[in-house]
Amino acid sequence: MLIKHFLQFKDLSLAEFKHIFERTLLIKQRFKAYQPYHPLSDRTLVMIFEKNSTRTRLSFEAGIQQLGGNAIYLNTRDSQLGRGEPVEDAAQVISRMSDLVMIRTFEQEIIERFAASSRVPVINGLTNEYHPCQILADIYTYIEQRGSIKGKTVAWIGDSNNVCNTWLQAAEVFDFNVHVSTPPGYEVEPERAGLFGENHYEEFANPYGCRAQCRSCDH
């Protein structure tokens, strides 16, 4: 059976994201009503952190526990990952003893190599190239508060980093637009951003383009 990973935003289809949002609404309703809901009972999430984090660790660890599962925290300082063990070997061992793996690391190549040797799904908790879980949460919040994001416009001001790259992928999946304003030398790189279809973004000169960029934006 093909293992489904979430390494960058475009790994999931629009239909799959809609299903996730429907389940999210159900889980939130049950949680607010103090109704136990443990679909992940006896399941284990391994969280591998090469880059430090507060919110990512808290959200994943609390989330898996609220759904009945358990979380194991690993970092490169106290595991073989920091002592030169090949990523592929680590993936085979860790995935034998877990049901799900989340990795927060530097290079996208590392998480892709891990996923290629893993027996269980792998989630990108952040890399230098992408931050899919962050934008997944952002879009769910927008839809929850304002309705459909289709056809809307998002403003991005700053360098074309991992978050920007992920917004651009999300725009292609959800069919909205992104107005991007970056400092000189930090413009969008379509290949690095992993764009695969019709462009859903427009670039504005920084800093003078920021005001024009933000006009009529929805987020």
Model segments located where?
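Active-site-proximal loop->helix
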Residues: 72-94, 117, 169-170, 187-199
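Positively charged, low-complexity intrinsically disordered leader regions
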Residues: 1-58, 62
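Glycine-rich phosphate/diphosphate-binding loop of Rossmann-like nucleotide-binding domains
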Residues: 50-62, 144-219
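Short, acidic/turn-prone active-site loops that include or flank metal/cofactor-
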Residues: 76-79, 126-130, 183-186
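Active-site cofactor/substrate anionic-group-binding motifs, chiefly glycine-
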Residues: 44-45, 49-97
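Short, structured coil segments at secondary-structure junctions
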Residues: 67, 97, 117-119, 174, ...
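Anion-binding alpha/beta catalytic cores of soluble intermediary-metabolism enzymes, centered on
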Residues: 91-94, 99-170
